[in-house]
Design a protein with these regions (language model features):
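Short, compositionally biased low-complexity segments
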Residues: 1-6
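Cofactor-binding active-site loop characterized by glycine-rich and histidine/acidic residues
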Residues: 8-23, 27, 31-41, 50-134
Length: 136
């Protein structure tokens, strides 16, 4: 009996790991597409934070795929928005064209926004730290 439970847990962890890899790939692709593949009239890169995404992918995969209940709410770290959008895409709440248009008009936002994003954002988490510059 214990062996069967252990085997089931191993399978579940392996599945979560595969989902995590897909989420990280989608998040990295979203940023790469915005900076290198999508046409840009002025040639400027739009940014994106792949390291911030990579640092949150395991945690966000565990939360969204296993731990969160329907009544739970999450404030996503702003620079991890591509991970959030990738998860929402896997849930069917975010279209691939939103990821393709990341940080452009009508695309997925660089910071989770309750008013601008089409997916289900619990809390808007805009750019942090810039407000303090207004007072200087």
């Amino acid at each position: 009996m214990a062996e069967a439970i252990l085997a089931a847990k191993r399978q579940e962890l392996a599945l979560l790991r595969r989902i995590e890899e897909r989420i990280l790939w989608l998040a990295s692709w979203t940023i790469h597409n915005a900076n290198h593949l999508r046409e840009s009239r002025d040639g400027l890169k739009v940014g994106g934070h792949q390291a911030s995404c990579a640092s949150m992918t395991t945690l966000m995969t565990a939360l969204y795929m296993k731990a969160l209940r329907p009544q739970d709410r999450v404030a996503v770290k702003p620079h991890a928005s591509p991970v959030f959008h990738a998860i929402q895409h896997l849930f069917g709440r975010q279209e691939i064209d939103q990821l393709q248009r990341f940080r452009s008009l009508g695309g997925a936002q660089s910071y989770p926004s309750r008013t601008k994003d089409k997916d289900d954002v619990d809390f808007s988490t805009g750019s942090v730290g810039l407000l303090s510059l207004i007072h200087i």
